Structures are given as structure tokens and as C-alpha cells.
From Swiss-Prot:
Binds together with bS18 to 16S ribosomal RNA. GO terms for molecular function: small ribosomal subunit rRNA binding; structural constituent of ribosome. One of its GO terms (cellular component) is ribosome. Belongs to the bacterial ribosomal protein bS6 family. One of its GO terms (biological process) is translation. HAMAP family: Ribosomal_bS6. It comes from the Bacteria. It comes from Desulforudis audaxviator (strain MP104C). Keywords: Ribonucleoprotein, Ribosomal protein, RNA-binding, rRNA-binding. Pfam families: Ribosomal_S6 (PF01250). This is Small ribosomal subunit protein bS6.
Length: 94
């Protein structure tokens, strides 16, 4: 298993319940594939460095996990088709 750091920015106009559901959905992708979430930090609403999709703010979430490469690929695929997401990044830590 590899160590990953995942950062994603949710749209600021999502309700708390909707953002919580998305975070649980993304975490479940890792845990369903025998991965482990080691850390999950919700940074809250912050101003973006530049405008993304007509938004100037977003809810930042940082997740550290241990997972197989296939789980990271699936997470990336789901990120790309999720409407409530502004931006995402998956980094493999060495």
C-alpha cells in the first residue's frame, strides 16, 4: 500500500449536509478498497488564490490515506465527475 495526500475544494454554496455526504462518499471509496484514512482535516471556507468556475471561495478538505494505486485511480475518476467539486489533487507521498 502507498501513502497518499488528497486535497480537494468543494463549492462554497453547498449545504453542510451535502458537503458532509461528499466527504463521506470520497472516504468510502478508499475504505471499500481496503484502504485506511489516517487523517482527515476540514479547513473550512477559504478564499481562493484565483477564481475557479466563477467562485472566489471554497471549502478545503485535506485527507491522508494508505491505499492501493487502483483506489487512488477510482477516487480521481469520481472527483472528475462530481459536480460539487471545484478542484482536486492526489499526491503520492514517499
Amino acid at each position: 500500500m502507498r501513502q497518499y495526500e488528497v486535497m480537494y475544494i468543494l463549492k462554497p454554496d453547498l449545504e453542510d449536509e451535502e458537503s458532509t455526504q461528499l466527504i463521506e462518499k470520497f472516504s468510502k471509496i478508499i475504505t471499500d478498497r481496503d484502504g485506511e484514512i489516517t487523517e482527515l482535516n476540514r479547513w473550512g471556507k477559504r478564499r481562493l488564490a484565483y477564481e475557479i468556475k466563477d467562485y472566489r471561495e471554497g471549502h478545503y478538505v485535506v485527507m491522508k490515506c494508505r491505499a492501493e494505486h487502483a483506489a487512488a485511480q477510482e477516487l480521481d475518476r469520481v472527483f472528475r465527475i462530481t459536480d460539487g467539486l471545484l478542484r482536486h489533487m492526489i499526491i503520492r507521498e514517499d
